[in-house]
A protein has these predicted regions:
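N-terminal regions that are enriched for targeting/export leaders
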Residues: 2-69, 419-440
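Long, contiguous internal "core" modules enriched in hydrophobic/ aromatic residues
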Residues: 21-43, 136-327, 340, 418, ...
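Membrane-interface transmembrane-helix boundary segments in multi-pass integral membrane proteins
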Residues: 235-241, 306-328, 346, 375-404
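Extended, compositionally biased non-globular segments
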Residues: 317-372
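Hydrophobic alpha-helical membrane-insertion segments
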Residues: 96-113, 284-293, 352-360
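Juxtamembrane/interface segments at transmembrane-helix termini
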Residues: 44-60, 76-89, 157-169, 228-230, ...
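Hydrophobic cores of alpha-helical transmembrane segments in multi-pass inner/ER membrane proteins
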Residues: 65-75, 104-108, 143-155, 243-258, ...
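Transmembrane-helix bundle segments that line or gate the permeation/cavity pathway
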Residues: 48-186, 206-209
Length: 440
């Protein structure tokens, strides 16, 4: 990825763009979606609580994994010291806004809805090892602990990033975060020193974010998806699942970048080359996701081990095969559609393929969860309840994200405008601020 060779904009110009408000209609739409979805969920709780909680669990799994992946994308930009993404990395950081609410939903799933979701709550595990792993106390403790670590690292990383901007700009933003912004300004020192300090601190945090994203979501995937079928096992399952979220995150980031470029009127900062880069990443991780999907299928199917093949056979049988086929086709379509540069930089085609990938991965999550819970029903339970709870999550995710963007600058300011912004490529002595000698 290149830095695109763009000249440094003025701080006043970037600040004006970063503080432009989003349309009130976007917040209203998210609010109405959340309200309608909540009504559907409450109605389903009364009529069919099993189906309601399973829809809640499935949508939590999809939206929370993508939110965690989105902020981890920002961590990767720090690890690689990327310059090309400086105008868009705040849009990645905004994904962290949903995680506190997702944690509350996690507690609801584990303490209120688990008997409606997980077979191991009312069926004995098939062997002592799985009984030990699925011990409720052990499972709840590790899931809550891992999620708190993942969320805490993400919030810490984004707090440091925001502080670097909040410390140099006048007070502005949503009233609910005024106290937090004031806290960020306390003790803010020399700009050059703050840049290096923040860069170094976030460099350490970013490494742990990536490690805990991979490990934490592997474990969460085992507990929230793999164990729904207590007789199935797969060593690739965790990788495959968290890479599904990784792909969904970069597709979501691409769509948000297109929208917020218009909101901020930042056409001269977020340029065609940014969409080319985002398109290349979307194409690459679609290919990698397809590789993992086919690789898992190939090994399981031709390995022909009964404890594994029944998982694939179920999803390739009626009534699930139709949804499985549609999910695979939609999720893999961006691989073919985004091969050319023209498709990446022409926004209507990019939007179409990004939406295709997101819907495909959404349905793929469905095929992860529902066949294990329902076996072979007459009809696949994909209706008003599942879609309604999906709308609930989409609306609440949108409200969290828009609240974050209303409270903080929508774009990194210091790292685009400071004359010291490129010094971070060279480590300095924290006491003297002089470059450290290079090691031959």
């Amino acid at each position: 990825m290149s830095a695109h060779g763009l000249p440094a904009p003025s701080r006043d110009d970037v600040l004006a763009m970063a503080q432009r408000p989003t349309s009130p209609s976007a917040r209203r739409l998210a609010f109405y979606a959340a309200g309608i979805g909540l009504a559907v969920f409450v109605y389903a709780l009364v009529v069919d609580p099993d189906r309601a909680w399973r829809a809640f669990h499935y949508n939590w799994y999809y939206f929370t994994a993508i939110s965690s992946a989105g902020v981890t994308w920002a961590a990767v930009q720090r690890i690689t010291t990327a310059r090309w993404s400086r105008p868009v990395v705040r849009l990645m950081e905004g994904f962290v806004a949903f995680l506190p609410l997702a944690f509350v939903d996690l507690l609801l799933i584990l303490f209120v809805g688990r008997s409606h979701i997980f077979p191991w709550t009312h069926t004995a595990p098939p062997n002592p090892e799985r009984a030990l792993y699925l011990n409720p106390t052990f499972l709840v403790a590790r899931d809550i602990g891992l999620f708190l670590i993942i969320m805490g690292l993400g919030l810490w990383f984004v707090y440091n990033s925001l502080r670097l901007d909040i410390g140099v700009i006048p007070e502005s933003g949503a009233a609910w975060a005024k106290g937090l912004r004031e806290r960020m300004r306390r003790g803010f020192g020399d700009e050059r020193r703050e840049i290096h300090t923040t860069h170094s601190r976030n460099g350490v945090i970013a490494v742990f974010m990536v490690l805990f994203y991979a490990y934490g979501w592997s474990v969460l995937t085992w507990d929230f998806s793999l164990t729904l079928d207590m007789h199935f096992q797969s060593t690739l399952y965790g990788w495959w699942s968290f890479m599904t979220a990784w792909l969904g995150a970069i597709l979501s980031i691409s769509l948000l970048t297109m929208w917020f470029r218009n909101v901020m009127r930042a056409d001269h900062l977020i340029v065609t080359k940014h969409f080319h880069d985002l398109g290349k990443l979307s194409f690459a991780f679609t290919a990698f996701w397809g590789y993992l999907t086919f690789g898992q299928y190939l090994v399981i199917w031709y390995g022909n081990m009964p404890e594994e093949t029944h998982y694939m056979h179920l999803r390739l049988s009626a009534p699930w095969i139709t949804i499985t086929t549609i999910a695979a086709a939609l999720a893999f379509l961006p691989f073919f559609g985004l091969m050319s540069k023209a498709a990446k930089v022409y926004l209507p085609t990019f939007i179409g393929f990004a939406l295709s990938g997101l819907v495909g991965t959404y349905l793929q999550r469905y095929t992860e969860v529902y066949p294990s819970l329902y076996g072979i029903p007459k009809h696949a339970p994909l209706g008003v309840v599942e879609i309604g709870v999906g709308v609930l999550y989409l609306g609440t995710w949108g409200l969290c994200y828009l609240a974050f963007m209303a409270a903080f600058p929508k774009m990194r300011i210091v790292m685009q405008t400071s004359r010291y912004r490129d010094e971070i490529q060279v480590p300095v002595d924290p006491r003297t601020m002089e470059p450290l000698p290079a090691h031959e």
